[in-house]
Amino acid sequence: MNIRENINSIKSGFHPSFWVANIMELFERLAYYGQATLLSLYLRNHLKFTEIETGQLSSVFGGLLWLLPIFAGALADKFGFRKAFSFAFLVLAIGYFLIGSTGIALFSGFYANFDLYWVLIIILIFTAIGGSFIKPSVLGTVALTSKTETKSFGYAIYYWLVNVGAAIGPLLAFLVRDSLGIEFVYIVSSISCALMFLSTLIFYREPPAKILENKDNLIIVLKKLFTVITNFRFIIFLLIFALYWVLFWQFFIVIPFYVSDYISPNAPIEIIISIDAWAIICFQIPINKLTKNISEKNAILIGFIFATFCWLFLFIILPSTQGIYTNILWWKNVSLGIPIIMAAIFLFSIGEQTQAPRFYEYIADLAPKGQEALFQGFAFLPIAIAWGFGGTVGGWLYYKFATQANNPKMIFFVLFGIGVLATLLMLIYNYVNKNKR
């Protein structure tokens, strides 16, 4: 089969709405990750919140953004993906604009009449509600617009585009922040989502009516959630795994603070954090091949160990790099701390790529027979739990050890300790449950 035949085969394997939905998802991810890498700095450095307040605000936004899709998916099924996309992008466009407007001088007189903390709580909740409809709508579209023989490839395209957005979004944010100011990153994210709102109205068509059977309404979703959270063994696993994601989210809380305070407020934090996504794009396939014979339990433990070692690496090495500058290829006179942090994030990413593909297999093994799909549908709860607490934890740690005690390396030691605890708990969990199904 030649290249043209391959392209035609791919095109014919998907309904046009598949491509529209995935392109819109790409632009949504560009908007999301562009602003997410800077949210903590925007709240603290630009809006002058404390680290604790910044962590709390980040927790509200991130926690809801990962929790609400459980319920948003049922509503998207009920009202249709076109309406869900339209609602999501309209709300995101308004929400990102409002977040950015809180830091623009033109609107300062208006916001001076209110407590900005609670204003942002409302805005962030509003924005998270809109964002929660994206993932179920895109995944639902992929499911309904792919042929049986192309469905797996369709999901691969979706996940690849998500990582492309996570890699390129921060780079665009860096360019905007450097040329216009940090507040305008949110305006650009707003414009991106507004364009996708128009794209939905113009290009997106509801998928063909081979609608999934037995769609769940909100009552059924709540019943399923109750079934899951009353499974003690599964909930313990989710709580342990949430510790892993708490470590990950500190790249968006602790690391931006540290880079701004101890390296340079003008350092390209967006580029630093995007290393995780670039590593996934470049190394996910070879790592999958190298680790395909490792058991699910061991793959997850490897992920935990890499995540733990990442913070130990920073604890030992990063403080000694202060005041040392070097040249890296075309990057001249750069603080040595920057490549050290990038190396730590890369280490974390290797572990993430090892455990992530096996995570759903592990959950299938944990689930009672006949309920594998149900339990996998709630597999992202650890991310929601981790964001819900991780932002607040990270903000508090930084305030106590860096702002008050001027001893930031202790933050890395505490995070290392959390990693050790998570790894030990997972080892104990696997031992206790090794003969259970």
Residue ranges and their predicted role:
Residues 59-74, 274-287, 385:
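Central cavity-lining transmembrane alpha-helices of secondary-active solute carriers
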Residues 2-15, 210-239:
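Juxtamembrane intracellular "pre-TM" segments in multi-pass secondary transporters
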Residues 49-63, 118, 153-156, 260-279, ...:
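Loop-to-transmembrane helix entry
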Residues 32-40, 232-270:
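Extracytoplasmic gate region of multi-pass secondary transporters
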Residues 114-117, 175-192, 396-420:
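A membrane-interface helix-boundary motif in multi-pass transporters
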Residues 90-115, 306-333:
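C-terminal ends and interior cores of transmembrane alpha-helices
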Residues 65, 152-177, 192-193, 379-392:
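Glycine-rich segments within core transmembrane alpha-helices of 12-TM secondary carriers
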Residues 68-81, 177, 282-302, 398:
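Helix-to-loop junctions at the C-terminal end of transmembrane segments
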